[in-house]
């Protein structure tokens, strides 16, 4: 053999690495490359090469930088994709941490690539959420009530140690005269540090209570005036958590089943907005205002010392764990994710309208239909979708699929006296309503299965809401690239 073999001959021509290479070449990586300008030095490896490596590793369910380094030595396809370059795990980890936000924002570009390939239809969009474990143990969390008890106990411990230290000082002064006493006893120092950590965590929860982000059980100065009784408890209201939407005008576009994007969809729900009865829809206190609005968090409000941004959430295994709430809006025609978000809110409902807005912003089109489960229902949200001529399929209550399928469809015209909830119940009993709602199960739930089980995203590697959010959006970007490859996407 006179010439060495070409690396591309090591893998078949229909292998996904060829598609990943082509897709990454079409992405705008200026947010990454600009980080090396203005005296930032040259990157040790081409950023395009590093992004290709991460895309293929995540597609194979490999996220550990050390396992990626091993793939670069042992996996033939990875060696071909990396042009036989072998960055070590330290380089891979630093690149991912440094450009994490930019990697997450590649998700929007994959949506545009799918749209360019004709794979974004927006005739029907299914929305759902899944809980992904945070990089923290639920045993690292402490409730506000336990914090108060522990702070009081440590206050007594510190007082006892101080009295003991003073007594020892006086005894040693009598025996030894002058001595150096600028260091704290070991037990006292540990108690002081622990108390300081707990009090900082209590302050975080108290600030969250004043903002209305956690359940409030007492408004101490105003309790008697409100007639709350001896306990000082007042009823808490369910807050929708809907951010007020700014009006944005999008580029007009045309697509199968979709319409040109008008002003951005939004609704500002009242504090007593109708809830959908979904899981985790606990109540929160209204934001405290005025000089008398001193609030205390509920004793069960949790703070995790490892990842304070994460929350205790119910999981699909009918258990509770330290998690984040990962949300996605998926095109029913192609299973392309058109909107993705991650938050530490337990309830799914507040994510519905922001996801529809994000899908419209990412594609320039409004979906014709939207389906979601009962956790997303509220009359305000349904009406907001209908005002923009989006046909919603969102049950007011959790559906038991066996009895629901056996129910006879309604006949005749709908009664005029039906409210929003009644009209939705009736619509979902029609043949058309059943068919459209069943699209949700075969659209978004398989996507979560592919990401969490086929590619192994059971837990985030990084801590903090911004880092976890970027990781989730990058996972969705990888999913879109793989979906385009399987559907044979071709760009003009």
Region locations from a protein language model:
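Short, contiguous pre-domain boundary segments
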Residues: 1-5
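Short, charged, low-complexity loops and linkers
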Residues: 6-11, 434-435
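Short, aromatic/basic-rich helix-turn unit that serves as a nucleic-acid recognition element
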Residues: 9, 58-61
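Secretory-pathway/luminal and periplasmic proteins that interact with or process carbohydrate-rich
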Residues: 78-83
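Basic, short loop/linker segments at the boundary and entry of helix-turn-helix/winged-helix-like folds
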Residues: 11-55
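Poly-acidic low-complexity segments
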Residues: 6, 14-16, 25-29, 46, ...
């Amino acid at each position: 053999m006179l010439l060495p073999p070409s690396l591309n001959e090591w893998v078949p021509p229909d292998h996904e690495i060829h598609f990943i290479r082509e897709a990454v070449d079409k992405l705008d990586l200026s947010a990454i490359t600009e980080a090396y300008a203005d005296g930032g030095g040259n990157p040790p490896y081409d950023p395009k090469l590093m992004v290709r490596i991460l895309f293929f590793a995540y597609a194979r369910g490999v996220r550990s930088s050390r396992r990626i380094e091993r793939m670069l030595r042992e996996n033939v396809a990875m060696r071909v994709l990396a042009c036989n370059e072998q960055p070590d795990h330290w380089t891979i980890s630093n690149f991912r941490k440094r450009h994490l936000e930019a990697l997450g924002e590649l998700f929007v570009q994959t949506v545009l690539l799918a749209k360019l390939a004709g794979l974004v239809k927006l005739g029907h969009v299914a929305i759902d959420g899944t809980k992904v474990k945070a990089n923290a143990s639920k045993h690292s969390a402490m409730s506000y009530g336990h914090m108060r008890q522990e702070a009081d106990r440590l206050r007594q411990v510190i007082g006892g140690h101080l009295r003991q230290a003073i007594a020892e000082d006086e005894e040693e002064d009598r025996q030894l005269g002058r001595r150096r006493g600028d260091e704290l006893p070991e037990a006292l120092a540990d108690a002081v540090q622990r108390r300081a950590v707990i009090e900082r965590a209590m302050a975080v929860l108290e600030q969250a209570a004043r903002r209305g982000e956690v359940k409030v059980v007492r408004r101490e100065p105003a309790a008697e005036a409100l007639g709350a009784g001896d306990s000082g408890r007042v009823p808490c209201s369910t807050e929708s958590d809907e951010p007020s939407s700014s009006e944005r005008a999008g580029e007009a576009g045309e697509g199968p089943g979709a319409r040109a994007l008008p002003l951005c969809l939004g609704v500002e729900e009242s504090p007593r907005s109708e809830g959908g009865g979904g899981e985790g829809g606990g109540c929160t206190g209204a934001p405290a205002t005025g000089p008398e609005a001193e609030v205390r968090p509920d004793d069960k409000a949790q703070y995790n010392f490892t990842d304070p941004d994460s929350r205790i959430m119910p999981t699909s295994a009918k258990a509770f764990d330290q998690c984040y709430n990962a949300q996605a809006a998926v095109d029913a025609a192609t299973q392309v994710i058109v909107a993705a978000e991650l938050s530490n809110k337990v309830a799914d409902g507040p994510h519905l309208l922001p996801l529809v807005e994000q899908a419209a912003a990412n594609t320039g089109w409004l979906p014709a239909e939207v389906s979601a489960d009962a956790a997303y229902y509220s009359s305000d949200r349904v009406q907001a979708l209908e005002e923009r001529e989006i046909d919603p399929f969102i049950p007011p209550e959790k559906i038991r699929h066996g009895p629901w399928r056996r129910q006879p469809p309604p006949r005749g015209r709908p009664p005029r006296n039906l409210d929003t909830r009644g009209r939705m119940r009736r619509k979902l009993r029609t043949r058309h309503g059943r068919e459209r709602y069943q699209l949700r199960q075969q659209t978004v739930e398989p996507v979560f299965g592919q990401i969490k089980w086929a590619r192994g995203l059971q837990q985030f590697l990084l801590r903090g809401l911004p880092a976890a959010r970027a990781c989730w959006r990058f996972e969705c970007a990888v999913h879109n690239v793989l979906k385009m490859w399987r559907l044979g996407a071709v760009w003009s």
